[in-house]
Amino acid sequence: MSITVYLLIVFAYLLGSVSSAIIFCRLAGLPDPRENGSHNPGATNVLRIGGKFSALGVLLFDILKGGLPVLLAFNFKLEPSEIGLIALAACLGHIFPLFFRFRGGKGVATAFGALLSISFAASAAGLCTWLIVFLLFGYSSLSAVITALIMPFYIWWFLPEFTFPVALVCCLLVYRHHDNIQRLWRGQEQPMWARK
């Protein structure tokens, strides 16, 4: 790999490490999302603890965190495997942020941003899948897991050369939701509309 790839991996991780949920909550005077709600510093939990505009800001910033490094990678005409590593680094930064004691979010919005930069069509299909599952069952976590499991097939259909890198990112997302999966299995996960 070239020095450009290594630099973009570091940049992606550091950008991913900027926890917008914590920053937006501090600016809006909301409680720390790591200590309230689901204890997850992400857009869904910020919405859950009462900050609609902050949640939107978090969502957009987290999407940008994944999308920008991947767009730069495409600009440098890197290989799909290298672009996949950069996308993975952004997600790892969000999940294990250097600047916030490695206590991060689930990485869904950041992964979506990266995938959006790789394939708009596949990302649109993934978003539709997420929405359908959410509207049917009301679980954000279930929507994320099912979408992550299906997304590699969408990518294979539209851009097969990115199937393996995207599958790695999706595996990370599923792993990050292991606690949610256990609660879903036990019937202990509450739907979004049941939470205050």
Swiss-Prot record:
One of its GO terms (cellular component) is plasma membrane. It holds the Pfam family G3P_acyltransf. The keyword Oxidoreductase does not apply. Signal peptide: none annotated. Keywords: Cell inner membrane, Cell membrane, Lipid biosynthesis, Lipid metabolism, Membrane, Phospholipid biosynthesis, Phospholipid metabolism, Transferase, Transmembrane, Transmembrane helix. Its EC number is 2.3.1.275. It is a multi-pass membrane protein. It is found in: Cell inner membrane. Probably interacts with PlsX. HAMAP family: PlsY. This is Glycerol-3-phosphate acyltransferase.
